Regions:
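Two-component system phosphorelay core
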Residues: 1-120
Length: 120
């Protein structure tokens, strides 16, 4: 993995040391997983469920994304998704709109950051 990508991810909020421990130091595997994550079908499915207020489906997709973002060490996005999962788990649906907006904003920020490194 290029030093530029490591630097950008660190600035984004990824603890590269801990994350690489999860990937047993395999930077190529991490980069591959990160690339696959960006095209994960859970994002459009979550958006569709949100637009139709299908809370059970939202929970399932958000929970999946919480696990993936956690494993990839994408802490800012993980925190946003985790907050939404918590609200959905406890049926605090009045909080979902604001939390979904935070998730979308954090995902957009991550995509901008990764765009600077040439990852897509």
């Amino acid at each position: 993995m290029a030093d530029t990508l490591k630097k950008i991810l660190t600035e984004y909020g990824v603890d590269m040391k801990k994350t690489m421990e999860r990937f047993v130091g395999d930077e190529d595997l991490y980069a591959e997983c990160l690339t696959k994550f960006l095209s994960d079908s859970s994002w459009p499915l979550l958006k569709n469920a949100y637009e139709h207020k299908e809370y059970k489906e939202m929970f399932e997709y958000a929970h999946t994304l919480k696990g993936v973002t956690g494993n990839l060490g994408l802490t800012p996005l993980y925190n946003a998704v985790s907050d939404m999962v918590g609200a959905l788990r406890f049926e605090q649906y009045e909080k979902v709109d604001g939390l979904y907006e935070l998730v979308e904003a954090e995902l957009s920020r991550l995509l901008r950051v990764l765009g600077q490194s040439g990852v897509d």
